Amino acid sequence: RASNPNSQTGPTIGGQVTLVISMHGRALWPAQQMKLTHWNRLADENGFIVVYPAGTDFPRKWETFDLGPDLERDVRFISELIDMLQSAYNIDPARIYANGLSNGGGMAFVLSCNLSERIAAVAMVAPAQSLPSGWCANTRPVPMITFQGDADPIVLYDGGSMGGPFNPARLVFPAVQGWVAAWAQR
């Protein structure tokens, strides 16, 4: 499920390198995420490793909408990916970051709770997440930054449900300001 990490050739801190995990949105592929983000160029210029794991099924997606075995499987996959990369490269365990677009941003959000002991910080663009308020019992704070436009037709800024092929289950997304404020207070 994971694409190959970039070939890291730049400077390191104490011989250890940073790892960035960049996750695609629903119905996208790792190669599209790589092209959208330009992380490879930045990684090669600044000496860190980036990897673009793939979600499951078709269309490709991360299971971020329901608490349950599918979500746990995706979290376990990312944890095992980190283990594999740490065994192959000298990854600094204090500098592992997750980011994503839309559904991949929702997965980064999930990792900020479920892998908070391994993830240093998360960055999300239009994160699609509809987990219930208070779903995360973990109290370790993980820094996050999120970007969301108020004209997004899929992840509605003021919350609600959009229909169509990208939301067949009619998921209801919370208002962005509300869930971000609640997350900051937890």
Which residue stretches match the model-derived regions?
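Short beta-strand/loop motif that positions the catalytic acidic residue
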Residues: T146-Q148
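Active-site rim elements
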Residues: T64-P69, P165-L171
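Conserved alpha/beta-hydrolase "acid-adjacent" motif
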Residues: P153-D158, G164, V172-A175
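Primarily recognizes the serine-hydrolase "nucleophile elbow" in alpha/beta-hydrolase
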Residues: S87-A88, A94-V142, P153
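Acidic, glycine-rich loop-and-strand cores that form catalytic or ligand-binding grooves
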Residues: A169-R186
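Phosphate/oxyanion-binding loops and surfaces in catalytic or ligand/nucleic-acid-binding neighborhoods
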Residues: A151-P153, R186
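Alpha-helical structural signal in soluble globular domains
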Residues: L42, N114-R118, A182, R186
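Serine-hydrolase catalytic machinery in alpha/beta-hydrolase-like enzymes
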Residues: R1-N6, G10-Y97, M107-V110, N114, ...
